[in-house]
């Protein structure tokens, strides 16, 4: 049963493949293809097919289990399905003959028969014989599949006779055919079927094949199958046909010729290849690997089919080709991208056609490599070419490989770039030409359409050249420009007509009549008509302006972020914060005042005498003062000491104060010069912040022999110098003393020093103190217009550069506080800086003691805004007008500026205000002295202003407060000695923007503060301090007449010659002399009207009386008590609510407005307000002004009187333009007061604190030049580093050496150099200007100037030589007299400056400009010396000559011809100095006294 159920086993056949075998002699170099035929049939997959099989084996391999010492191979079996579906198993045996690799003879085996007989054997036996796979299997059987021959024996069922029909290898086909014939004979004996396989038909030789076919025909029609194992053609057919012969039940196979079978097979391969390639093309990343892709595709049928037919190796090759194609495609795209990017790179690196137009490609490449942006556009690879590096994978790196430029494509792009630049240049030229054509067409108006203009330019060459789009673009740009310009001019016009808008209250709405008036006035303006075609825009601008006028805020300001209020707040926020930090550092430096260091300066042994006197009064250098012991360290220095400046300030000795003692005009002159030098040096180099506050005290030594003759002059000149320098003056006490110095003098001076130190500590206290505004003595409002062409730093620098400047009350971001000595006391002044639009509300609602009105002399709108604002200011409030421009030369060169400056000064003259011009290119505006006289005037009118303000606010009230501000307790200090700001005492600028015509004589405004004594000397008007000072400050002192001066019996008359000089000077002055004491002896004076006539003008309740103390100049020092009785208010009292504090000249009137005092202001108002004001009302308004001003206005003339001492005694406070007409007017209304002679009660003026530059100790800077150089290195290392840095990085910097660098950076450069002389300035990231400033500071720090003082006179004389060649040779000989060290450094510096001047077209620094900036540093001038001031221009021209003729002076070169060579100035006689100093050469706006005499007595023209 079981046997029946078993499935029948498929039939099994054994086929023996035979053919020519044997040694190489028998078969040639290669076999006939038996092994390949078997391999392809048994293992048909391409990866399992091995084309190479060898029959030469070693003995070991022959004895292995695969060969097993037999000459046949067992290839295994394969199960085959027939066409009828019947399976059969075919075992394949290959009969061969193995050759020994040693003897090259057949191996000996168990069967010793020859191959022909062995091959015909039908029974084969070999125990444990393994299946053969390939040659590599031999000896490594364990690494391959191990399959044994079934049962170790097989019976052969048929033979497959292989005949090679190819050309063969060293084998004759006839020999093969003969061998085959013999073999066939043996095979026939076995009675087994035989089929002939014609092998290697892919290399078939046709006649060989025909012979095989003939052979088969002769042998009982043997079947011949044409095969090719390489291409797998008809291999299976051979075995199938043989099986069919064995099993007749199977269908007879169809034998296909080789060519037909090959085509069929190749078609199958091609189809599989196409499918595989499509499969491979799905891979898009050329970074993909075969391993990754094959793992993904191994189960895909198309992949498997191709692998079976062609094999993995071909599949990998196909994949590699595809990947390479992807890579090349990527490289191609990158190359195209680079080529497309090249034009942009060329535009970046080679934009200038003139530079590259004539360069070839290689030269252009070299030029590109030098560009700073080269690395941004190109990358230079270490390995080339670029497409074989990993750069192709850097997708994010868009830089072009530089080696790509070596291709022809890149060169072609470059040529196209050049051509594009040429055409673009032509196109731009034609567009600009067309633009100029449009600009020449006058009738093109804003808003005019292109169509209306096009017909007028049709024939224009440029229009024809450019495209229509370009034409429209150019016209659109032209329209935008003219529209924008028209709108700006329209807006500027609105500001110029500010009087038309600023007549209504804030937050008001203009009426229709007002709008009609505005349009009527503006319609006459061309700038109004210019926007005719843009009427909606014009109306919008007008409404926007009106909205801003009536609702002015920072947010609505038409200047936006450039609003003055915003700029001021930002500047104050940063400046005051930095100032606080500096004060904290200064506070910590000023610690111990138990020990006082005093520097004593004198001449002819005076300093040592004073030091001896102080030591006499001390005990072991300890001095008792006011119950406290102070250790004194005295440092007396005589004027003759050559190292006087270096001794003043050393690391071991830092003085708390300086006593300057004098006993003659000569010694006083020396003191003035010395202090001027110190202050000049301190302001230029700023050695230490502490030195800025160093107090000076002038001490007059007693003269026992000639007290009656010289003492009054010395006292007057000493006091005058002290006032000028803002420092205390210690006079000789009254009485006779045996010694030169009195104990009271020393104590008074020492107290002053201690008070100054104490005040400095209070000023720089790190504890922030926000004092209430009510504590400010004065409140000043500075107004500036938004959009003016100057920085707010220019107008704020006089305050911010002062050490006494501090922040105002919290919340007042636009205010600052200034501590300044005004009159006899230190005052706190609140400065509020506002735009004009913000000031309107302040003007109407808040108490203001004075206005500083700033305007730009370059802008009419600025003057218009000033006029509109000033017109509504009450005429009781002092005003200072400030015109701002670049330089004094603008007045000469620009008529518009000249007109505006003249108008400003004219208005100031009309309203008796002050007028000042500030120049942005000058440094003088950084001194608060610009406003000193104005502050004094404001203080004088303070009470009147406050009462006027109080009256306006409480006009309906019957009760008035006596004082507006509470008195400040500090006004009662018995001793007021405070250091003034840096600016109040800063020396005049080293040079003037125009030249050397500096006014050295005191102006009338300055002289009004002095009166003449009996001997013709001017005395400052001041009084003795007492505890009631605050009452006299805040109450109105009645005008008094001084009692007759009682002559002292011991006063001697002046030298008659001096007296005649003074009288002659006064006689030349046409001013009234009633304001001065007559030039007569005391006994000749009339005393009939010399008593006080008090008028108390402070309004009080009826019946109220008070006592006010006044201090007339009484020689007996008596205090006169005056009772003031108040009666019922007059009509004026009732009308104004108060009684005017001024003298009868002012009358009892209500305050008016400035527009009624100025013809200029009123004429403007009249032209605008003609719709609302009649002519009669205008005349009436002016009538009142006329009656009050009649006879008061007069011109001022220069007083030719010169003080017998130096120029600083003339009261020169401001070289800027200043007009002080009102001070002169006061001389008519007030009687002068004589100075009290009692110096014990004299007020102390503030001390001078020269600013310092360096605030650290240095072993390098400030040292003598000889200590900083060696024979090997004659140039100081610091100078060398600075010059190299400047020449390497900033030679073309605009304004080099003129534009100031950052002060902190300059200090850091020197500090870092102090620590490490090898520093690299480039690594410090500092600006060129900072390095230039540090270089100038180095020379300013030197103990002696680089150009020695001893050679200054010789240089001066040589510069006056008329002949240029002779002058240059004389200067050259003087330079040779320099110390060798100075000569080397001077040559180095001048050579550097010459290089700088050579770049003047870029840096704008000509030799002239450089000499202006450098000559004060190189020559260290004494600006307090009158003779030196008169020669400043000569010294500057000498330095300019050195710079221009550098090659001639130092390198034996030729004289260079220059266009602006400065001719030698005419020689001046020192005796004629007065005439040369009279400022007649300056224009009227710059010297007001030249205009005022030409004005009518009544400037308004009413009479």
Curated annotation (Swiss-Prot):
Biased composition range(s): Pro residues: 1036-1045
SMART domains: FF (SM00441), RhoGAP (SM00324)
Membrane topology type: Peripheral membrane protein
Domain (pG1 pseudoGTPase) ranges: 590-763
Phosphoserine modified-residue sites: 590, 765, 951, 968, 1115, 1196, 1203, 1219
One Pfam entry name: RhoGAP_pG1_pG2
Record-annotated site: Arginine finger: 1298
Residues bearing the modification 3'-nitrotyrosine: 550
Annotated spans, Disordered: 975-1004, 1022-1050, 1069-1091, 1129-1157, 1169-1255
Keyword Secreted: no
Top-level taxonomic group: Eukaryota
Name this polypeptide is given: Rho GTPase-activating protein 5
Organism from which the protein derives: Mus musculus
Gene: Arhgap5
């Amino acid at each position: 049963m079981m046997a029946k159920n078993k499935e029948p086993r498929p039939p099994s056949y054994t086929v023996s493949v035979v053919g020519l075998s044997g040694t190489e002699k028998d078969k040639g170099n290669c076999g006939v293809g038996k092994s390949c035929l078997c391999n392809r049939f048994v293992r048909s997959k391409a990866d399992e097919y091995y084309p190479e099989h060898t029959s030469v084996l070693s003995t070991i391999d022959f004895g292995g289990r695969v060969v097993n010492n037999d000459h046949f191979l067992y290839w295994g079996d394969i199960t085959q399905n027939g066409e009828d579906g019947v399976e059969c198993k075919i075992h394949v045996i290959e009969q061969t003959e193995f050759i020994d690799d040693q003897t090259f003879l057949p191996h000996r085996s168990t069967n010793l028969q020859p191959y022909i007989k062995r091959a015909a054997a039908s029974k084969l036996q070999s125990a444990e014989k393994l299946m053969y796979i390939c040659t590599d299997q031999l000896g490594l059987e364990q690494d391959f599949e191990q399959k044994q021959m079934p049962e170790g024996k097989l019976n052969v069922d048929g033979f497959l006779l292989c005949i090679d029909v190819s050309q063969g290898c060293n084998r004759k086909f006839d020999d093969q055919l003969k061998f085959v014939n013999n073999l066939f004979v043996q095979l026939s004996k076995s009675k087994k079927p035989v089929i002939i396989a014609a092998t290697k038909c892919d290399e078939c030789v046709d006649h060989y094949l025909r012979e095989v076919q003939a052979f088969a025909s002769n042998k009982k029609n043997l079947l011949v199958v044409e095969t090719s194992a390489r291409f797998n053609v008809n291999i299976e057919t051979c075995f199938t046909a043989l099986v069919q012969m064995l099993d007749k039940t199977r269908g007879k196979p169809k034998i296909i010729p080789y060519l037909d079978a090959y085509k069929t097979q190749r078609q199958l391969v091609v189809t599989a290849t196409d499918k595989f390639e499509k499969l491979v093309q799905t891979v898009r990343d050329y970074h993909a690997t075969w391993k990754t892709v094959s793992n993904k595709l191994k189960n895909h049928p198309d992949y498997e089919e191709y692998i079976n037919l062609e094999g993995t190796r071909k599949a990998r090759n196909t994949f590699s080709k595809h990947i390479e194609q992807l890579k090349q495609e990527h490289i191609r795209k990158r190359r195209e991208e680079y080529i497309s990017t090249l034009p942009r790179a060329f535009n970046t690196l080679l934009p200038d056609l003139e530079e590259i137009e004539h360069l070839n490609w290689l030269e252009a490449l070299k030029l590109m490599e030098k560009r700073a942006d080269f690395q941004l556009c190109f990358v230079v690879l270490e390995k080339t070419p670029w497409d074989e590096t990993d750069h192709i994978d850097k997708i994010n790196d868009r830089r072009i490989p530089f080696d790509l430029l070596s291709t022809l494509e890149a060169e072609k792009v470059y040529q196209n770039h050049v051509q594009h630049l040429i055409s673009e240049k032509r196109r731009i030229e034609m567009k600009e030409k067309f633009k100029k054509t449009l600009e020449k067409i006058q009738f093109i108006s804003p808003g005019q359409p292109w169509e209306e203009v096009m017909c007028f330019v049709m024939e224009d060459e440029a229009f024809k050249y450019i495209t229509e789009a370009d034409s429209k673009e150019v016209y659109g740009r032209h329209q935008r420009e003219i529209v924008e310009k028209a709108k700006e001019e329209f807006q500027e016009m609105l500001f110029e007509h500010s009087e038309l808008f600023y007549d209504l209250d804030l937050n008001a709405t203009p009426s229709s009549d007002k709008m009609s008036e505005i349009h009527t006035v503006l319609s006459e303006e061309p700038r109004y008509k210019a926007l005719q075609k843009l009427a909606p825009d014009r109306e919008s601008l007008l409404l926007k302006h009106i909205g801003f006028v009536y609702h002015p805020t920072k947010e609505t300001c038409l200047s936006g972020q450039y609003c003055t209020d915003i700029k001021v707040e930002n500047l104050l926020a940063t400046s005051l914060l930095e100032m606080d930090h500096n004060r904290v550092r200064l506070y910590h430096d000023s610690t111990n005042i138990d020990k006082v260091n005093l520097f004593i300066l004198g001449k002819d042994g005076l300093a040592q005498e004073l030091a001896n006197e102080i030591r006499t009064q001390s005990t072991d250098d300890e001095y008792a003062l006011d119950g406290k012991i102070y250790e004194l360290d005295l440092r007396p220095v005589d004027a003759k000491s050559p190292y006087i400046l270096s001794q003043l300030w050393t690391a071991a000795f830092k003085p708390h104060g300086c006593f300057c003692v004098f006993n003659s005009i000569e010694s006083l002159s020396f003191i003035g010069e010395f202090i001027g030098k110190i202050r000049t040096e301190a302001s230029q180099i700023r050695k230490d912040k502490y030195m800025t506050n160093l107090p000076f005290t002038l001490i007059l030594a007693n003269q026992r022999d000639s007290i009656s003759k010289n003492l009054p002059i010395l006292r007057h000149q000493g006091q005058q110098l002290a006032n000028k320098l803002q420092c205390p003056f210690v006079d000789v006490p009254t009485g006779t003393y045996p010694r030169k110095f009195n104990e009271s003098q020393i104590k008074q001076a020492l107290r002053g020093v201690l008070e100054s130190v104490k005040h400095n500590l209070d000023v720089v206290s790190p504890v922030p103190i926000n004092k209430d505004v009510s504590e400010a003595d004065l409140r000043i409002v500075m107004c500036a217009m938004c959009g003016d062409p100057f920085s707010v730093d220019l107008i704020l620098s006089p305050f911010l550069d002062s050490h006494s400047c501090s922040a105002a009350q919290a919340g007042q971001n636009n205010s600052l506080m200034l501590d300044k000595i005004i009159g006899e006391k230190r005052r706190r002044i609140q400065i509020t800086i506002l735009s004009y639009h913000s000031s309107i509300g302040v003007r109407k609602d808040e108490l203001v003691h004075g206005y500083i009105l700033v305007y730009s002399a370059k802008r009419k709108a600025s003057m218009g805004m000033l006029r509109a604002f000033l017109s509504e200011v009450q005429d009781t409030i002092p005003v200072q007008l400030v015109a701002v421009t670049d330089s004094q030369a603008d007045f000469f060169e620009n008529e518009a500026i000249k007109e505006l400056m003249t108008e400003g000064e004219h208005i100031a003259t009309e309203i008796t205000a002050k007028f000042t011009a500030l120049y942005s290119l000058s440094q003088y505006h950084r001194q608060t002295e610009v406003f000193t006289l104005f502050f004094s005037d404001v203080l004088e009118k303070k009470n009147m202003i406050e009462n006027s303000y109080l009256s306006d606010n409480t006009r309906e009230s019957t009760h008035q407060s006596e004082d507006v501000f509470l008195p400040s307790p500090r006004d009662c200090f018995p001793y007021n000695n405070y250091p003034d700001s840096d600016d109040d005492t800063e020396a005049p600028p080293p040079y003037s923007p125009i030249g050397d015509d500096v006014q050295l004589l005191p102006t009338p405004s300055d002289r009004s503060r002095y009166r003449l004594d009996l001997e013709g000397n001017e005395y400052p008007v001041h009084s003795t301090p007492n505890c009631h000072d605050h009452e006299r400050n805040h109450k109105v002192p009645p005008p008094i007449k001084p009692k007759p001066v009682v002559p002292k019996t011991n006063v001697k008359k002046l030298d008659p010659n001096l007296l005649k000089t003074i009288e002659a000077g006064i006689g030349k002055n046409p001013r009234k002399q009633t304001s001065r004491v007559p030039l007569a002896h005391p006994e000749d004076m009339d005393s009939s009207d010399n008593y006080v006539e008090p008028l108390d003008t402070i309004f009080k309740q009826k019946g109220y009386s008070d006592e006010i103390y006044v201090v007339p100049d009484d020689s007996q020092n008596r205090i006169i008590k005056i009772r003031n009785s108040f009666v019922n208010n007059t009509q004026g009292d009732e009308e104004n609510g108060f009684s005017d504090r001024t003298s009868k000249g002012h009358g009892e009137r209500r305050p008016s407005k400035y527009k009624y005092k100025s013809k200029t202001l009123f004429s403007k108002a009249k032209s605008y307000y003609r719709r609302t004001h009649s002519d009669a009302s205008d005349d009436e308004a002016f009538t009142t002004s006329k009656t009050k001003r009649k006879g008061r206005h007069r011109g001022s003339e220069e007083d030719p009187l010169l003080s017998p001492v130096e120029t600083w005694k003339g009261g020169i406070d401001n070289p800027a333009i200043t007009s002080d007409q009102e001070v002169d007017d006061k001389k008519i209304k007030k009687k002068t007061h004589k100075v009290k002679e009692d110096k014990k009660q004299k007020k102390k003026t503030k001390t001078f604190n020269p600013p310092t530059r360096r605030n650290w100790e240095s072993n390098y800077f400030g040292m003598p030049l000889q200590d900083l150089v060696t024979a090997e290195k004659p140039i100081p290392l610091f100078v060398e580093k600075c010059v190299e840095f400047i020449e390497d990085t900033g030679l073309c910097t605009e304004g080099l050496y003129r534009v100031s660098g950052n002060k902190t950076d300059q200090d850091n450069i020197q500090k870092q150099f102090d620590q490490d002389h090898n520093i690299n300035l480039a690594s410090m990231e500092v600006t060129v200007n900072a390095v230039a400033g540090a270089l100038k500071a180095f020379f300013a720090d030197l103990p002696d100037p680089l150009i020695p003082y001893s050679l200054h006179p010789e240089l001066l004389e040589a510069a006056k030589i008329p002949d240029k060649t002779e002058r240059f040779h004389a200067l050259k000989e003087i330079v040779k007299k320099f110390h060798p060290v100075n000569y080397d450094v001077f040559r180095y510096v001048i050579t550097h400056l010459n290089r700088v001047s050579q770049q003047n077209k870029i840096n704008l620094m000509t030799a002239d400009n450089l000499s202006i900036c450098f000559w004060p540093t190189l020559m260290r001038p004494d600006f307090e010396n009158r003779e030196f001031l008169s020669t400043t221009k000569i010294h500057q021209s000498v330095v300019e000559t050195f710079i221009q003729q550098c090659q001639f002076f130092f390198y034996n070169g030729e004289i260079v011809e220059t266009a602006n060579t400065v001719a030698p100035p005419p020689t001046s006689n020192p005796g004629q100095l007065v005439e040369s100093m009279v400022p007649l050469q300056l224009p009227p706006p710059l010297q007001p006294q030249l205009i005022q005499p030409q004005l009518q007595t009544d400037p308004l023209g009413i009479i």
